[in-house]
A protein has these predicted regions:
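N-terminal beta1-alpha1 ligand-phosphate binding loop
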Residues: 2-46, 50
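Catalytic domains of carbohydrate-active enzymes, especially glycoside hydrolases
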Residues: 206-222, 433
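Active-site-adjacent loop and "lid" segments of alpha/beta metabolic enzymes
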Residues: 149, 190-206, 226-251, 256-257, ...
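Short, conserved charged micro-motifs
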Residues: 16-18, 67-73
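Flexible, gly/pro- and Lys/Arg-enriched active-site loops
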Residues: 48-56, 70-73, 77-169
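N-terminal amphipathic alpha-helix/helix-capping segment at the start of soluble metabolic enzymes
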Residues: 158-191, 357, 413, 460-464
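Hydrophobic/aromatic residues located in beta-strands of well-ordered beta-sheets
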Residues: 5, 36, 180, 258, ...
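Short, charge-patterned binding micro-sites
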Residues: 38-65, 223-233, 313
């Protein structure tokens, strides 16, 4: 009979993100481990006991296993050895550290093995990812839930949730500030910038350089327009447009987070191999059944968006329910619309977790535009917190309102509205969304947004 076991994972030497991913892969292939059912978010923290060493990355995972606690300990130690861990002194630096925290309800008190782990209650870097997975799990000895134990840890937090935007080379600390994704469309038919950067790789790379200089933290490369009624491009043409551009940007910027804007698993894989570090999927995995499993196998971040419609594709279906929120019934019942976005997006996140996508690699996007009426879009701006409540509340959020039609149409025909006002208004809408917890903003006009964020972050980000 399988037992639910919780494992702590840490690294502070070498490629820490890569080490943790490799350890998870090795663990999934251990005989007697049925599957890895969940992971926590990723946390960075200073060393706790021996301070003269590099900072740690930590997380936890939950597995189903038929192994006894002792045999599981032996398997974990074998993984550590195979990955090159050298035991020097207690609490010293290590390429990988794997510890059994809980093994179901079992209690073990042997000289070389104690389960539950005796130091759980004093380690925030263990309690934080544990609470991500199982906050209501009751410690079999302390008789308290994980969440209650964490709350009783009356210490100043030095444990920060982070996002491997470009592996270990570029870690975003969530909550420290708002991050900017600059848009690079290498398409002939995108609404506002189609045809500007698709004529040559050099033109696209030059624009990427401009985006970074203006303050972009991520450059998002897309090869197919997703505007309403846009022509569907075949995958070979999409790949022809984006792969060489991504490869050249990576040569220019070794540590820059680069995302590929695609709903195709084959394009995502080739883009990651060319140097992209994030997959940005406007369909949340609904337009290609292989997308989520591909992202899981690649071990890269995945931006999972809610959409009712993408380009000229038929409306997206979430089970037996459409994602379209365009007709007047939704405009009359905005709460129902927000609930629909929340529930359907939660279902896609569940699909990611079930397919083995690490929790720390998931970013959610409510999908401004994309089959939503203007009323629904403005409700999302105003009540973003409601649309990302419940089980998806802990996840970081990306929003994209830049040059969207619902903003543009608001001022269409106004005599004071010149050629650039729609961009300015989009920036204002983005800044408004920040207070309801947007972590990344996807925009065309990076410089304008950068200025707005200087003010907004000062108001809404308590760490700034």
């Amino acid at each position: 009979m399988a037992t639910r076991s919780l494992i702590a994972i840490g690294s502070n030497i070498g490629n820490r993100v890569g080490n943790i991913l490799k350890a998870l892969s090795e663990l999934s292939h251990v005989p007697g481990v049925t599957r890895i059912t969940s992971t926590g978010f990723l946390y960075e923290s200073p060393p706790m006991y021996v301070e003269d060493q590099p900072v740690f990355l930590n997380t936890c995972c939950e597995i189903e296993t038929s192994l006894s606690p002792r045999n599981l300990m032996i398997a974990l130690q074998n993984i550590e050895v195979s990955m090159g861990r050298e035991r020097t002194f207690k609490n010293g630096p290590r390429i990988i550290d794997l510890d059994i925290l809980f093994h179901g309800p079992h209690v073990v008190n042997d000289p070389d093995l104690i389960v539950p782990h005796p130091c759980i209650s004093e380690r925030e870097f263990v309690l934080a990812p544990l609470a991500d997975i199982c906050p209501s799990f009751v410690h079999p000895v302390l008789k308290k839930t994980i969440e209650d134990i964490r709350k009783s840890l009356n210490a100043y937090s030095t444990c920060h949730r982070v996002f491997p935007a470009c592996g270990d080379r570029s870690l975003f600390r969530w909550g420290s500030r708002t991050f900017i994704m600059g848009i690079l469309n290498v398409t002939p038919d995108s609404f506002s910038d189609g045809g500007l950067y698709n004529e040559s790789v050099d033109a696209a790379v030059c624009h990427a350089i401009d985006l970074v200089a203006a303050g972009a933290d991520i450059v998002d490369v897309g090869g197919e327009s997703t505007r309403p009624k846009a022509e569907i491009v075949d995958e070979l043409e999409e790949q022809r447009r984006v792969i060489d551009v991504i490869r050249e940007i990576r040569l220019k910027f070794p540590n820059l987070p680069i995302s590929v804007d695609t709903y195709r698993a084959s394009t995502a894989r080739l883009a990651i191999e060319a140097g992209a570090s994030i997959v940005n999927d406007v369909s949340g995995g609904l337009l290609d059944p292989d997308m989520i499993s591909t992202v899981s196998s690649l071990g890269v971040p995945y931006i999972c968006m809610h959409a009712g419609r993408v380009g000229s594709h038929p409306p997206l279906m979430y089970g037996d329910q459409s994602g379209l929120l365009e007709d007047q019934s939704f405009s009359r019942n905005l709460k129902s619309s927000l609930d629909t976005v929340r529930d359907q997006l939660a279902g896609r996140v569940d699909a990611c977790i079930a397919s083995g996508v690490a929790r720390w690699n998931i970013v959610i996007d409510p999908g401004f535009g994309f089959g939503k009426s203007a009323d629904v879009n403005f409700a999302l701006v105003r009540h973003l917190e409601d649309a990302i409540s419940g089980v998806i509340k802990p996840y970081p959020v990306m929003v994209g309102v830049s040059r969207k039609r619902f903003v543009r149409d608001l001022v269409a025909g106004k005599e004071w509205c010149g050629s650039n006002e729609h961009a300015m208004l989009g920036t204002v809408a983005v800044a408004m969304a920040i207070q309801d917890r947007a972590d990344i903003h996807r925009v065309h006009d990076v410089a304008q947004l950068k200025y707005a964020l200087c003010v907004s972050d000062r108001v809404y980000r308590r760490h700034v």
